[in-house]
Amino acid sequence: MQMSYAIRCAFYQLLLAALMLVAMLQLLYLSLLSGLHGQEEQEQYFEFFPPSPRSVDQVKSQLRTALASGGVLDASGDYRVYRGLLKTTMDPNDVILATHASVDNLLHLSGLLERWEGPLSVSVFAATKEEAQLATVLAYALSSHCPEMRARVAMHLVCPSRYEAAVPDPREPGEFALLRSCQEVFDKLARVAQPGINYALGTNTSYPNNLLRNLAREEANYALVIDVDMVPSEGLWRGLREMLDQSNHWDGTALVVPAFEIRRSRRMPMNKNELVQLYQVGEVRPFYYGLCTPCHAPTNYSRWVNLPEESLLRPAYVVPWRDPWEPFYVAGGKVPTFDERFRQYGFNRISQACELHVAGFNFEVLNEGFLVHKGFKEALKFHPQKEAENQRNKILYRQFKQELKARYPNSPHRC
């Protein structure tokens, strides 16, 4: 009897041990399965935001190379230029969107990346030593977390010559090292940025817009130079590439992209049909309509909005240049550079458009593509020194036009 009881106890102990072993194996299996699922999720995440030491090291190496020399001084000696803070492989025969921005306005890059499918080149101006530090950190964070930035964007930095930019510590400023996605970087930038009134830098340094424009477009055979707070129509890059593939004889021609501004409460139009509907009810108007109507009037907006709808981008009509037209355009070949003596507000773009005219360029308005600025441009939104700067640059513009006569002595055109 006692033997039978002992056998039964041993049997139950063995059964209990077996059940416990099975339970442990099941827990181990579930743990491994969960770990595998988590690994798959991580792999999917890292496919979009590669965190490998190699990719981070490449970014560091690129920034270190660009910053190591201490930059080069511009022709005036007032600014320090760092080329290739970020680099990307660009086909010299592609159409590059070239733009410029203060550090605060870099947040507009997000919208440009969505609308412009081709390569971008942006020149960033840092007015202070702190902004120069922030610019290098932003370059590090954006290139680390934004695949589109790594693939399509070249970035250059300009700061006053008395400052030098340093290799960034990604932990400073603003804890950008804690971010894990491209959207988080742009969201963080929107929170730390302090957008102000146009050209109001709060320092004794002038915003070198033409230096920045030249820097952004200097490696491009074909470039559309715009302000960073403008947005191109959907498919504009594809349309321009198709035009370029069909005919690369753009030398001597400026393909004008009509520019508009939209009421800030309105959604940005994607295509011409949406834009025209808003234009007809006054929610969209010609660019600079409230500040300088003649500056864009030769585009002939009434003619443009009434063109028949077409699927292909093409030049629609030729417009003779007249002062003070300053269109946004795409051109190839030897395009005159922007005169870097013009800084801050006034005559910085018209001076280059004037030289295009004297050099013999033709101006042809595209039928479908366009640019839109978010918000109506109003005089009260500019800094108090605007008029003084405008008068100073007006005097320089008169001198510039006299210089063009000597530069193009055989040209029949004058501004």
Swiss-Prot record:
Q: What is its EC number?
A: 2.4.1.-
What is reported when this gene is inactivated?
Early embryonic lethality.
- Kindly list every residue the record annotates as glycosylated: N204, N300
Question: Which stretches of this protein does UniProt put in the Lumenal compartment?
Answer: 37-415
Q: Which UniProt keywords apply?
A: Glycoprotein, Glycosyltransferase, Golgi apparatus, Manganese, Membrane, Metal-binding, Signal-anchor, Transferase, Transmembrane, Transmembrane helix
Binding of Mn(2+) occurs at: D227, D229
Q: List the pathway annotation.
A: Protein modification; protein glycosylation
Transmembrane segment boundaries: 9-36
Q: One GO molecular-function annotation for this sequence?
A: glucuronosyltransferase activity
Cytoplasmic membrane side: 1-8
Which cofactor is essential here? Mn(2+)
Q: Where in the cell is it found?
A: Golgi apparatus membrane
Listed under catalytic activity are: 3-O-[beta-D-Xyl-(1->4)-Rib-ol-P-Rib-ol-P-3-beta-D-GalNAc-(1->3)-beta-D-GlcNAc-(1->4)-(O-6-P-alpha-D-Man)]-Thr-[protein] + UDP-alpha-D-glucuronate = 3-O-[beta-D-GlcA-(1->3)-beta-D-Xyl-(1->4)-Rib-ol-P-Rib-ol-P-3-beta-D-GalNAc-(1->3)-beta-D-GlcNAc-(1->4)-(O-6-P-alpha-D-Man)]-Thr-[protein] + UDP + H(+)
Quaternary structure annotation from Swiss-Prot or TrEMBL: Interacts with LARGE1 and LARGE2.
Purpose: Beta-1,4-glucuronyltransferase involved in O-mannosylation of alpha-dystroglycan (DAG1). Transfers a glucuronic acid (GlcA) residue onto a xylose (Xyl) acceptor to produce the glucuronyl-beta-1,4-xylose-beta disaccharide primer, which is further elongated by LARGE1, during synthesis of phosphorylated O-mannosyl glycan. Phosphorylated O-mannosyl glycan is a carbohydrate structure present in alpha-dystroglycan (DAG1), which is required for binding laminin G-like domain-containing extracellular proteins with high affinity.
By sequence similarity, the record places it as follows:
Belongs to the glycosyltransferase 49 family.
Protein name as annotated:
Beta-1,4-glucuronyltransferase 1
Say which species the protein is native to: Mus musculus
UniProt gene name? B4gat1
